[in-house]
């Protein structure tokens, strides 16, 4: 996955290209939620019990298993929000999260073509260097 800063820069550039003024304004008013969404599930890679192998890492699960269902549920959850501000905050977060997924989807084939898919200390370091 691209690094935190890479995801943020991608999100800023994507935001600048949004033509729809309603969407543009919602994201502007909810910049923090959008920025958090841009990080996707990557924050969970730093959850210590999962990093040490005591539990399955939720970041891996969200990235690799039933991704379509995850997005479907994420989007459906917005319909239960009754306050307009809550809806806009959730909308901005989801827009950011989708941006995260788009960048990961575009970058991974390139990264894998450069370093392969096997995991070792060397390839993992190269993998992170390319993504960042």
Which residues are covered by each model-predicted region?
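N-terminal, motif-rich segments that launch catalysis or mediate targeting to/interaction with membranes
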Residues: 1-92, 110-132
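Short active-site segment of divalent metal-dependent hydrolases/proteases
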Residues: 44, 99, 103
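Short alpha-helix carrying the canonical HExxH Zn2+-binding catalytic motif
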Residues: 91-99
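Alpha-helical transmembrane segments and their lipid-water interface positions
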Residues: 104-108
